[in-house]
Structures are given as C-alpha cells and as structure tokens.
Amino acid sequence: MSGHEHYNENYVLADNLYEHVHAPLSTLFWQAPWACDGTPGGYAVYEFDGGKVNWYYKCVGKDKDYQFELYPVGASRNKKEAVVANVWNYDSTWKVKWYENGIDKGEMTRFSGYDPAIYEYCEKNSSTFKHKYLGADITEHLFYAVPETKDSEIRVEVTDHCGNVYTRKMQQSK
C-alpha cells in the first residue's frame, strides 16, 4: 500500500503482488471534495477472512456501493460526445460495461483525461486555494461510451476484482 499521493491508482504486478496507491481522506489538501483525479474523499477498507483479502474504497458520507461516478454527454472536456465514468478504484481485473435503453453495448473504452467534477471545481475555486499549485490532474481510470441517441437511458455496470457489481443509471436529455 502506498499513501502519500493525492490520487487513486491500482496495479496488478503479478498474481500475488498488487500495489494500491490510496487517495487521501484530505482529498486535495482539504481544498476540494475530491482528489486531483476525481476520487471523492474517503479511505480503503480491507477485509480479511483466513487467507482471503477483499477490499474496496469507502467514500465519506456515501454507501459502500458508491464506487464510481457517471457523467452525462457534454460533461467531459476530453470526450464531449460521450458519457464518462470515473472508476476510482479500478484495476485491470475490473469490467466496465454499459447499456443503452436496456441493450448491452459491451465494455466502455478506457482513456486518460480529467474528471469533470474536480476539473470544473478547480477552474471556479483555485484562486481561493491555500496552495496555488493545486488543481485537477489527468487520470487513467476514466471510461467513455458514445450513445446512439440523445435521449437514451444509460446504465453502467462496474464489476470489481471480487465480483461485486455496482450500477448507476442516467436518463440522457435531448
């Protein structure tokens, strides 16, 4: 486990070697509700059962099932034509699928970019930050998909390393 960073990243280095880089509870030095990669303030929870270890990221004030954020078309400066999911505890064993109007569209495409919420927050509030060098940073745990219609219902299902499935829905508007 690594901790002295202001973002969340996970690496599967071998079958028995995994590196967790934890975003801090203090997010962006207490200047924003998210870390620079859009990870909400929170902490890692590890559950041990004999030789088995499970883990998840617990966002402060949110249910354990809140494991990603879903943004509508137009929210992301990097992918304006797409819905975007920020899956902050993602690693290469996770699956990020999407559905449009109930039809399975397959896996979303991973990309590097800015989380829309922290980017917008920093644009509006950085002049009040105690440390002027703080801001949004590019992250690799973003996923996108381009809907076929503008008024479709979008559902995203994220399956973690333990097989837990997390779901978010949104209704697109014209």
Language model segments and positions:
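Long, low-complexity serine/threonine/glycine- and acidic-rich segments characteristic of extracellular
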Residues: 70-174
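Conserved beta-sheet core of the metallophosphoesterase superfamily
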Residues: 1-74, 104-106, 123-124
